[in-house]
Amino acid sequence: MGRSLKKGPFADAHLLKKIEAQADNDKKTVIRTWSRRSTIFPSFIGYTIAVYDGRKHVPVFVSEDMVGHKLGEFVPTRTFRGHNTDDKKTTAR
């Protein structure tokens, strides 16, 4: 179930403040954030945002196709190590 249209998209205020500060200084450094729930706005395009995955910050370069999605969608939190392989061969009884 999606967010109500009357509420509009959400982004943490501290993240918006960091992006506006970089836009004013014309600098593009990596922005570290823990806010996986923030929606990507068009003003985020071209910036690299390091999103926390529970262990480390993973850099995500924001492109035009990502607008409207959440930051957490692009950084998986679980590592899949594959299914257990059984190399047991059938033996004659």
Curated annotation (Swiss-Prot):
Superkingdom classification of source: Bacteria
Instruction: Please indicate if the UniProt record lists Acyltransferase as a keyword.
Output: no
One of the entry's Gene Ontology molecular-function terms is: structural constituent of ribosome
Q: Pfam families of this UniProt entry?
A: Ribosomal_S19 (PF00203)
Annotated Gene Ontology cellular component terms: cytoplasm; small ribosomal subunit
**One Gene Ontology term from the biological process aspect of the record:** ribosomal small subunit assembly
Q: Which UniProt keywords apply?
A: Ribonucleoprotein, Ribosomal protein, RNA-binding, rRNA-binding
InterPro entries, sorted = Ribosomal_uS19, Ribosomal_uS19_bac-type, Ribosomal_uS19_CS, Ribosomal_uS19_SF
Question: Its family?
Answer: Belongs to the universal ribosomal protein uS19 family.
What does this protein do, in the record's words?
A: Protein S19 forms a complex with S13 that binds strongly to the 16S ribosomal RNA.
Question: What is the designated name of this protein?
Answer: Small ribosomal subunit protein uS19
Organism the protein comes from: Lacticaseibacillus paracasei (strain ATCC 334 / BCRC 17002 / CCUG 31169 / CIP 107868 / KCTC 3260 / NRRL B-441) (Lactobacillus paracasei)
- Which lineage? Bacteria, Bacillati, Bacillota, Bacilli, Lactobacillales
